[in-house]
């Protein structure tokens, strides 16, 4: 019989996967740079609070998580971005444990298959391989 510590992890809701998933300092080859991995839910927390100016409570509700969990995700995201900017690291966006919040093609969706509109399996749970 397997026992789990704590509560089960709830997938975070994000609006969409970003179009651009890699940022690096100009003029330096990427192979020479250290990288900082920013998860999709960390990027979503930055988008909601710092870009859209939503209060933490609204942003946490939008992501389907508690304010405390939201704060921890946001704090981690800000630390990673600051480290990358100050120390000249590459920012690699990807991974995490999330679901896409909305899909504009729900009526035409084929559950369990790749979305023909490029939404990347919007109804399928995404999880890190870690």
Swiss-Prot record:
<protein>
    <recommendedName>
        <fullName>UPF0251 protein MmarC6_0272</fullName>
    </recommendedName>
</protein>
<dbReference type="Pfam" id="PF02001">
    <property type="entry name" value="DUF134"/>
</dbReference>
<dbReference type="InterPro" id="IPR002852">
    <property type="entry name" value="UPF0251"/>
</dbReference>
<comment type="similarity">
    <text>Belongs to the UPF0251 family.</text>
</comment>
